[in-house]
Amino acid sequence: MKKIGIVIFLMLALAVLYSCQEYEMVQYGAGQQINFMGDYYLGQNKEPYWEDDTAYLHYEVNFGINPLGDSLRVDTVLIGVKISGAMVDYPRKVVFKTDAPDENALEVLFPETYYVPADTGQAVFKILLKRPATRNVTYSANLTFDYAQSDFEAGTLERQFFRLKAEDTVNLGLWGSYEEEWDGYYAMYFGDYSETKARYLITKY
């Protein structure tokens, strides 16, 4: 009986050891999965604060409301990624692609080849959004990973897409003004309101 008890104990110990090793492989092994991170302050001209929360995996820009006017052709966006699995001592390639609708597809430019540096589990990359070709229309695209060309596998499902939207729209409300202000002040110098006049004034004030 004593020998049987020892055998059972050893079998249980081996089972526990195997399950622990299997767990560690899942948690820290060679899975090398990639996920998007979101910047809590994205679009607010502040230092990035990266979050895993999916609520921050989006970015919207209005090219119409900017002091550069029509000369602003692209908008720069910082995209953060986080890697699960063990860190490695060599750079690993990340390739993005977009999933966009058939109409009003936002054009996204990738100005460089992207790599996650060695010995790190996070990286930040720069992408460019092109100004929409048509005014007063919302353009959109989902940024995702090209897994076939990247050195990573897909991570958490809900963190595999980063939503992008852009428009080129101007009206009094978006400019931060209102009809009474225009009629009571700007109309004395520029006459009746028009979008063209508002776009000009945005570049001056």
Whereabouts are the PLM-identified features?
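Positively charged n-region of N-terminal signal peptides that target proteins for export
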Residues: M1-G5
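C-terminal motif of bacterial Sec signal peptides marking the signal peptidase cleavage site
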Residues: V16-S19
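Acidic/polar, low-complexity intrinsically disordered N-terminal segments immediately downstream
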Residues: Q21-E103, G173-Y205
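Beta-sandwich strand segments
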Residues: Q27-Y28, Q149-F162
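Short beta-strand and strand-turn-strand segments in soluble, beta-rich domains
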Residues: D99-Y115
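Short proline/glycine- and polar residue-rich coil/turn motifs
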Residues: Y114-Q122
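Exposed aromatic-hydrophobic patches
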Residues: Q122-K130
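Short glycine/proline/serine/threonine-rich loop/turn segments at secondary-structure transition edges
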Residues: A133-S140
